[in-house]
A protein has these predicted regions:
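Helix-loop-helix junctions that connect adjacent transmembrane segments
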Residues: 99-105, 109, 117-119, 123-233
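Transmembrane helix-loop junctions in multi-pass membrane proteins
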Residues: 5-10, 80-88, 110-122, 145-151, ...
Length: 303
């Protein structure tokens, strides 16, 4: 998924520069791909389709399972907090509504589609992915021909800030816990799993580089915003403000769907509930995994 990582990297790397960011995107992309392939192989070797904590319990024992489960929960909730917060900022910019109202508007399609599970998300992702690619091509092309563009900005670098950027790049790629769900979706064609992961990782890498490159090319470092598309739109004009931020909302939305479904499946697997499609199980878990990040975002406890 392209979500908080893609949209926050330009701001995070404003002191280090694009070359440092690209270097870490390539390194962490390769490392993450290796780990995802390892998880994919382990998943396919395990006859029962289980989530990452289930695999860890089988091969690493109970302690490993608990640690992996905690990591999945923390990372998933962190991403969802960023999506709720970022969507509020974007809709405030576009519609002039308070941030908390924007967050609640985002919540409707985010939680609504996620409720119906993998099939609904699959259809939504296909349609929105095409739209995202078209919008990204338009924005990037407009950036390259913009009068306020400055090529020197994308070549500036300060390796003193390289280490913190590693963390940003690694966070952008984290998706190993999505692999068991991919295996579940391709259980009838297991040979397609590894190529699908590799292609997906390549596409993510390209998108992760294009977004900050386009933003940094037309925006001075001191004017970069935490959500990249806000600065992108301000630099290109009103039309771009809407396109860029609709792109951002779609990116957050599709990532939210994947992460929320995976977190739900991990909880069901860890506590050995019989199915994540049972309403009596799905409803209370959904309320919890939506309610925690939503409450933290609206309360201002995190930002």
């Amino acid at each position: 998924g392209i979500g908080s990582g893609c949209l926050g990297t330009a701001y995070s790397a404003r002191l280090a520069g694009l070359p440092v960011l690209v270097f870490w995107f390539i390194v962490t992309g390769i490392l993450t791909l290796f780990s995802m392939m390892y998880v994919a192989e382990t998943t396919l070797r395990t006859r029962t389709l289980v989530q990452l904590p289930g695999l860890a319990e089988r091969y690493l024992g109970p302690a490993g399972s608990i640690l992996i489960f905690i990591a999945v929960v923390i990372n998933s909730l962190s991403c969802m907090i960023v999506y709720f917060s970022g969507s509020g900022n974007i809709l405030n910019e576009l519609l002039g509504v308070p941030d908390w109202v924007g967050t609640l508007i985002f919540l409707i399609p985010a939680a609504g589609v996620a409720w119906f599970g993998l099939k609904a998300m699959g259809v939504g992702n296909k349609l929105m992915s095409i739209g995202m690619i078209v919008m990204l091509v338009v924005l990037t092309a407009a950036s390259m021909i913009a009068k306020n563009g400055d090529l020197s900005r994308i070549f500036q670098s300060n390796w003193t800030y390289a280490i913190p950027i590693f963390n940003v790049a690694a966070f952008s790629y984290i998706g190993q816990y999505l692999v068991p769900d991919l295996a579940r979706g391709l259980s009838h064609e297991p040979k397609k799993l590894a190529p699908a992961i590799a292609l997906g990782q390549l596409i993510v890498c390209v998108l992760l580089i294009i977004v900050p490159m386009g933003v940094m090319y037309i925006t001075p470092a001191e004017d970069l915003t935490q959500v990249a598309t806000i600065a992108w739109g301000r630099s290109l004009g009103l039309w771009a403000l809407y396109i860029a931020n609709i792109f951002a909302l779609i990116a957050m939305l599709t990532s939210y769907w994947a992460i929320s479904q995976t977190l739900l499946s991990n909880i069901v697997d860890k506590f050995k509930f019989h199915s994540d499609e049972d309403v009596k199980i799905r409803l209370p878990i959904t309320i919890v995994i939506v309610g925690i990040p939503l409450a933290l975002t609206l309360s201002g406890a995190v930002g």
